[in-house]
């Protein structure tokens, strides 16, 4: 299992992912789920994956093959709109799944992968897309300016409470970190290092990128402050009516 998310706010895009792969309790490994492609002044693409690692790697290999082939029919550099790039990735994923479909069915395994694509092409607005295993895709909406893939449920509540179009890029990044940390605490199949990338609208340059381990000072401080803050907020919640009555009763002799 994995967890990746992308947020779209007025000033830009935020991407975050864990780095754990899990093929059972006896085989847990670390693998980056985020790829960044940048042609300064022209376009920026960030791609994250969840699901079948074999399918994800095959799609990444096909992307790199087409980028290195001047005669390729399409590549990340060809699309005039980012949704055309999303269509291209969806087709690559579908082709890879179809190639191994019968063998996977016999072993009762799944070759499905989900992708999040985000970035910007010169002259166009920055966008994020969730590309499904079936090859179709959706974009983030005004009301829900984020996308998630993988183990999504534990990290969703904080996004719903905090993220809006007007959220600053830095606050969106902090929220993404908390969302990932909440998931890591609740699901053993999601784990650090955490990769974080931030892209500023219209910069058309390499996104800021950093990797945080369990021992990274910023991550350790964030975890502690968030946990302490939750405890303080919980302790300050309103009392039930019967607690108030009990508190007002005179102490017995």
Report each predicted region and the residues it spans.
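N-terminal nucleophile
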Residues: 1-253
């Amino acid at each position: 299992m994995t967890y990746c998310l992308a947020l779209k706010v007025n000033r830009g895009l935020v991407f975050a992912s864990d780095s754990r792969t899990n093929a059972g309790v006896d085989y847990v490994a670390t693998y980056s789920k985020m790829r960044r492609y940048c042609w300064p002044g022209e376009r920026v693409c960030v791609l994250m994956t969840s699901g079948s690692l074999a399918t994800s790697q095959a799609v990444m290999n096909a992307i790199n093959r087409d980028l290195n082939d001047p005669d390729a029919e399409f590549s990340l550099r060809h699309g005039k709109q980012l949704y055309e790039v999303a269509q291209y990735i969806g087709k690559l994923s579908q082709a890879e799944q179809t190639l191994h479909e019968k063998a996977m069915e016999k072993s009762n395994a799944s070759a499905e992968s989900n992708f999040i694509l985000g970035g910007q092409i010169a002259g166009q607005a920055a966008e994020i897309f969730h590309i499904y295993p079936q090859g179709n895709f959706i974009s983030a909406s005004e009301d829900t300016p984020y996308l998630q893939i993988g183990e999504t449920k534990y990290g969703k509540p904080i996004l719903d409470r905090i993220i809006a179009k007007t959220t600053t890029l830095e606050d969106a990044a902090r929220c993404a970190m908390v969302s990932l940390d909440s998931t890591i605490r609740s699901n053993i199949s999601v784990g650090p290092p955490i990769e974080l990338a931030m892209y500023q609208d219209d910069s058309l340059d390499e996104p800021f990128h950093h990797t945080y381990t369990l021992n990274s000072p910023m991550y350790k401080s964030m975890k502690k402050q968030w946990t302490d803050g939750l405890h303080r907020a919980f302790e300050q919640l309103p009392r039930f009516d019967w607690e108030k009555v009990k508190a007002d009763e005179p102490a017995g002799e």
